[in-house]
A protein has these predicted regions:
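Extended glycan-interaction surfaces of carbohydrate-active proteins
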Residues: 1-37, 59-110, 115-119, 123-132, ...
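Intrinsically disordered, low-complexity regions enriched in serine, threonine, proline
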Residues: 138-140
């Protein structure tokens, strides 16, 4: 994972955001350049968080969240020169990546020592049955 992060940083970072791929090779057959891909940038947030680079994860997350428009929507790409969203808009893939990155950060911020069936705060999750099946006061521990 660390090698992949280093390769992404070396070859795909552009103005601090992540390109989906480099168009310089012409492999896609399309004219023109691409801009940094919002989902890829959120994926880097998650990778930073999971690899212990939490400060960098938070910094990039803050930058990316600052790109949303006035109603909180994201597009497919971001043009750092024009400072505007470009490409498909709104882009659900970008929003899904935002949620995934936020979850990755919440895991490291909370220490994520959670056992299955517990919430991030350590409490019992709603999907675990702790109610008794009878009046004996013993828990069934599940269904």
């Amino acid at each position: 994972v660390l090698g992949t992060i280093a390769a992404v940083e070396e070859d795909l970072l552009h103005n601090g955001l992540v390109m989906r791929y480099r168009t310089r090779s012409g492999v896609d057959g399309l004219e023109g350049d691409e801009h940094p891909f919002v989902a890829c940038s959120f994926w880097l947030v998650a990778a930073y968080a999971k690899s212990g680079r939490v400060k960098e994860a938070h910094a990039l997350m803050s930058r990316l969240v600052g790109l949303v428009n006035d109603v909180g929507l994201l597009s497919e790409e971001y043009d750092p020169t024009a400072k505007r969203m470009v490409g498909n808009f709104p882009q659900a893939f970008s929003h899904l990546a935002l949620v995934s990155a936020a979850f990755a950060l919440s895991e490291v911020d909370d220490g994520d020592d959670n056992e299955p069936g517990t919430t991030m705060s350590g409490g019992q999750s709603d999907d675990v049955d702790t109610e008794s099946d009878d009046d004996s006061g013993t828990s069934s521990g599940g269904r």
